[in-house]
Amino acid sequence: EPTVFTAEDIRPVAQACFTVPYPAVPDNLAAYQVPDEAYTSSYRIRGQQKNAAGVNEQLDYFQYYQVNGTPREGSISFDNAARHYQWKRGDETVGEPSAAAMQTALSLAEQIAPAFELAYGDRTYGMNRTDLETLPSAQTGSRFVFTRSYQGVPSVYTSKDCTSYDNLNDTYVRKIPYEVLYIIVDDLSGVLVEWRSPHTITGVETENVRLLSFAEIMRIAGQLLPLKYASQEKYLEARNQDAYRMTVNRIALSYTRVQSRNDPSQYLFVPVWDFFDANDPLTSLLTISAIDGTVIDRGYGY
């Protein structure tokens, strides 16, 4: 189920990330509450200091609530890298994540969230916002994505979050983002960490659930994939853009979170098969329940 971060979550982030021990990691979040003027239903705490090199190190904690008081997503972030408006995914021209950066990220993740495992890594570059536009900077880095695992199996990571189709003004059915831990190690050894939308596994609904055979999953996918992308395929074919047509190059069995049918405030961690696009390693073209073969829309979260 979705939960809120506590001081016990913030403390290991601070201990792992600050290069100089931070003296004021909160024991009581309420005592450090600072209203966020941009959102009446949220609060924020912040800790910052300069390290030995004079670089500012900053830890932020945000928690958002619906107007009825129900917790929404929260996030803990740390940054001692050069400040950028955002980081964007790189492409094949910027290479693979470095081994040193991966070791740094794995070490931080082990200290911050031991129940998480590495799900994906790529190269990234910083973006700076000017008065007129957002432009890429010369600074690049390695990005690593960690997701919660269960019994040694991580939940797969895709670029589509369950808030993709959300109506931001509809607080009653507001979706909770998938839990994820991002760690970016830039090429100057700066670190950016973001852990968002914490969840807690509260129990097991079904032990030793029987999964459909892979042959049955392939039969279902063979029926559904052509139907789902028929119009897009015809569009690309008509314009001789065969290079962009849908091709599956990876099929993965993992866990994902789906909303409970009986209680929308609760979620289930279920085994699924994902069929990934050859043109984008983070795009799942189809997600199928490994239990009953139903299709799961990652944009809706069920």
Where are these regions (language model features)?
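Preferential activation on post-signal-peptide N-terminal prodomains/segments
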Residues: 1-173
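Glycine-centered tight beta-turn/hairpin loop motif at sheet-sheet or coil-to-beta transitions
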Residues: 52-54, 280-283
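Segments that shape or occlude catalytic/ligand-binding pockets
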Residues: 108-269, 274-277
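A short, surface-exposed interaction/processing loop segment used at functional sites
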Residues: 68-95, 178-183, 187-212, 283-302
